[in-house]
């Protein structure tokens, strides 16, 4: 996710979606609860959604083999990262990757779940070309994590809690490729056997907005604690969604599963689309069939994939090749201590400690390295016995200018800029000092900041400014002469200004900045302009 998108998602309150077609739906809130209103009949319906998120564990090797976990890395030859275990060669036995266990524990602790000290692995049987074993190793009876919750903040300020049922460890499948041969489907097993955390929610969602918020928040949490890269565009985080609708105060409807959603936008759109389909069927006295469906992003409609299997169809039984997974309480406590500050705890602290707005704090915690840089800038200032810095100016540089530069240069990781010494805390605070001292204007400061970020010149901010002659002009006599001459040379604009056309004032400011190449002190120019324009008032 790029940095401008992070800002836009927060500005737009994250994925809020209302369908407005003639046979569509409208989100409504009644007594602090979300409902759907049919635009065709004006009847009120309740939407119920549950989500299964499959997030690849961030580990060097796969779940049960020593094959490289390629994750989102591109460029690997098909079937080049496959062991005998991954390909299900007879006699090849699985060996559990302990790092996958650690990542699942971290995830469970971060959502307030209970770590199951005794968990087991089961075999889930089904036949598909990219599942060479004929079964998936998963955890049905005793998953590694039980319980937990995630708090959502909705667009209208309401809080909504999503309960987590459990998290289970399981294998990812391979990939079926259908577009490389005109008559054959090909199989790539590089992904087969990568560790997955299946994070299963309760059916606590009652709007597509809640789902969008949840996906974004869970994705951010997994990245923050380092248990998964969770990049949906690379398939590192995929979602299955269960949807049903019913009239308020009646029994839940028949649920339909939407399979393998790989973008938050698609998930939200598919929920609205499927809700419309189900409501339309029910309003026409038809029944909902229990099935698995896909979503066509081009048409915006869901489509039938297959009849939904029951649990008995998978013939679950304990995996005889894997012993019980036993986790000591000491290990759980050690991992808990290593977790560090979680995003929501950080947000609350930033608001309290620095008097930040909810909006600014939310933006900062989107990237842990940005938040750390913000705090280090303040600490650096305090350690050098300087006066309290204007926090808003730091935020403007970080959340507006630096985010803008990162986005325009297609850089996803702010931390890489720091690691490559393009932007140090010292340079950043020096630049802020020069602006506060009036040595340069904010606009020139932005120019210098971008030069530093580009990494082409390692000189200090002041040396960069002086070498280009960009220091601010604060000479009263020089600016007085420029302003007086400008006003004298533009009598028509002066008349328009006194007729109430305030845009003309911007014209005068712009002309002065143009003549001084943006270096004139705006405060001095502003005072001089008012002085000479008032003198011309008849």
UniProtKB/Swiss-Prot annotation:
Family: Belongs to the GatB/GatE family. GatB subfamily.
Protein name stated in the entry: Glutamyl-tRNA(Gln) amidotransferase subunit B, mitochondrial
Transmembrane listed as a keyword: no
Keyword Coiled coil in record: no
Pfam families assigned: GatB_N, GatB_Yqey
Miscellaneous comment text of the record: This protein may be expected to contain an N-terminal transit peptide but none has been predicted.
Organism of derivation: Dictyostelium discoideum (Social amoeba)
InterPro entries assigned to the protein according to its UniProt record, in alphabetical order: Asn/Gln-tRNA_amidoTrfase_suB/E (IPR017959), Asn/Gln-tRNA_Trfase_suB/E_cat (IPR006075), Asn/Gln_amidotransferase (IPR018027), Asn/Gln_tRNA_amidoTrase-B-like (IPR003789), GatB (IPR004413), GatB_Yqey_C_2 (IPR023168), Gln-tRNA_amidoTrfase_suB_CS (IPR017958), Gln_synth/guanido_kin_cat_dom (IPR014746)
Molecular function GO labels: ATP binding; glutaminyl-tRNA synthase (glutamine-hydrolyzing) activity
Coiled-coil annotated residue ranges, if any: none
Subcellular location: Mitochondrion
């Amino acid at each position: 996710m790029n940095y401008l998108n992070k800002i836009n998602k927060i500005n737009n309150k994250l994925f809020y979606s209302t369908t407005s077609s003639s046979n569509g739906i409208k989100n409504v809130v009644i007594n602090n609860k979300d409902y759907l209103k049919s635009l065709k009949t004006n009847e009120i319906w309740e939407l119920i959604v549950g989500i299964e998120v499959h997030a690849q564990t961030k580990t060097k090797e796969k779940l049960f083999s020593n094959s490289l976990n390629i994750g989102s890395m591109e460029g690997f030859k098909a079937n080049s990262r496959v062991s005998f275990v991954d390909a299900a060669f007879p006699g090849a036995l699985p060996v559990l990757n302990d790092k996958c266990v650690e990542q699942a524990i971290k995830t469970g602790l971060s959502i307030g779940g209970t770590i199951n000290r005794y968990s087991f692995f089961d075999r889930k049987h089904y036949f598909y070309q990219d599942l060479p074993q004929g079964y998936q190793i998963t955890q049905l009876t005793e998953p590694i994590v039980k319980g937990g919750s995630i708090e959502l903040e909705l667009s209208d300020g309401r809080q909504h809690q999503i309960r987590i049922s459990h998290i289970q460890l399981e294998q990812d499948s391979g990939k079926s490729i259908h577009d490389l041969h005109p008559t054959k489907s090909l199989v790539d097993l590089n992904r087969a056997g990568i560790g997955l955390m299946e994070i299963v929610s309760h059916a606590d969602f009652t709007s597509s907005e809640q789902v969008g918020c949840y996906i974004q928040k869970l994705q951010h949490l997994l990245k923050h604690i380092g248990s998964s890269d969770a990049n949906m565009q690379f398939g590192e985080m995929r979602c299955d969604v269960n949807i049903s609708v019913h009239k308020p105060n009646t029994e839940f409807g028949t649920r339909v599963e939407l399979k393998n959603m790989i973008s938050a936008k698609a998930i939200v759109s598919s929920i609205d689309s499927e809700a419309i389909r189900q409501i339309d069927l029910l309003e026409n006295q038809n029944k909902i069939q229990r099935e698995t469906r896909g979503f066509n992003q081009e048409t915006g409609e869901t489509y039938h994939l297959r009849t939904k299997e029951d649990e008995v169809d998978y013939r679950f039984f304990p995996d005889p090749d894997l012993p019980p997974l036993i986790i000591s309480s000491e290990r759980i406590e050690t991992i808990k201590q290593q977790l560090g500050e979680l995003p929501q705890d950080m947000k609350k602290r930033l608001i309290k400690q620095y008097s930040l707005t909810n909006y600014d704090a939310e933006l900062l915690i989107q990237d842990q390295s940005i938040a750390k840089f913000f705090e280090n800038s303040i600490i650096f200032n305090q350690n050098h016995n300087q006066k309290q810095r204007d926090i808003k100016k730091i935020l403007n540089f970080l959340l507006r200018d630096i985010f803008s530069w990162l986005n325009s240069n297609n850089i996803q990781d702010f931390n890489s800029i720091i690691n490559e010494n393009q932007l140090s805390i010292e340079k950043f605070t020096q630049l802020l000092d020069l602006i506060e001292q009036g040595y340069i204007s904010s606009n020139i400061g932005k120019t210098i900041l971008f030069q530093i970020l580009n990494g082409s010149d390692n000189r200090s901010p002041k040396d960069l400014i002086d070498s280009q002659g960009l220091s601010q002009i604060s000479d009263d006599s020089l600016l007085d002469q420029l302003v007086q001459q400008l006003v004298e040379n533009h009598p028509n604009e002066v008349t328009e200004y006194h007729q109430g056309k305030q845009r003309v004032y911007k014209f005068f400011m712009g002309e002065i900045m143009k003549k001084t190449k943006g270096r004139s002190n705006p405060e001095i120019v502003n005072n001089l302009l008012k002085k000479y324009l008032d003198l011309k008032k008849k």
